[in-house]
UniProtKB/Swiss-Prot annotation:
Expressed by the venom gland. The keyword DNA repair does not apply. Belongs to the neurotoxin 15 family. 01 (magi-5) subfamily. Disulfide bonds join C2-C16, C9-C21, C15-C26. This is Beta-hexatoxin-Mr1a.
Amino acid sequence: GCKLTFWKCKNKKECCGWNACALGICMPR
């Protein structure tokens, strides 16, 4: 699956939909 907004991440491919990985957290663009 994918990681939701505000979940910890290492890269943007881990995050759901349009979310980007910023500062180690999935953030909406």
